[in-house]
Amino acid sequence: MKKQSYIIALLAGLFALASCQDGNWDIPEGIPYGNNDLKAGTTVTIAELQSTYASVISSDNYKQITEDLWLRCVVNGNDYGDNLYKQLSVQDGTGGIIIGINGSDQGAFMPVGQKLLINLKDLYIGGYGNMAQIGGLYNGGLGRMELTEWKQHVRLIMDNMPEAQAFGTMKVDTIDFDPNKTMAQQCGRVVRLSGVTIARDGTPVIAPDDGSVSLVSNCVNRTLSGGNAGKKCVLRTSTYASFKGVTIPTTPVELYGIATIYRGTWQILARTQSDLTWVK
């Protein structure tokens, strides 16, 4: 399925290239994903957005964004490794946030480092386990927005476009995980954990699906201890992740991932196998 998606993305890229046969090789007529007609209005940062809706987020409620607000951000995590299920993680210079999208293989179009311009008006923001998330309504609560809706609200910004200048030096960066930081300070960011030990319950691989460990929504939560993990931190991995069978070392390791939190427990989501630094 993922291979097919990348073939589609490649063909889409060739289509965009073909549209430049009039001599303008720098800027294609349009990118075959998202809404190329979007033009930014009043912009807001992720920190400002989370501050404005802080009470909604902390109470696990939700609210529709009715103002014409725009967000400039960059993708720092996607579903390429099949561990961020129907989720996109983005950041700007002030923080990070998770976006729920009811669509698969979005990493084929929005790789890590891709700049996005998002029209927030009419989307929903709220809390899931006290963590901020942007999405849509599902069964009367906050969930994932439909893919068709997402594509109407997002524009992919390439570095050779004039619009890219407004992003300044925005890029994906990594911060050291700190268990004492708040949700707004750390969630949706790429974090580094050093000198941590991963629990080896059951079959000692990252996410066994053989019944040897308990699953929560088809995910394995492995306790992280030592190093900078703090007291309530787990490595959360889907049993569908492409790296689910990686063996867990018996010694402390360094690992990376997207920081999320659920009701006071930090959950680290490795994006791909490369986030597990002991794998060569």
Regions found by a protein language model. Give the residues of each.
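Bacterial N-terminal signal peptides that target proteins for export
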Residues: M1-I8
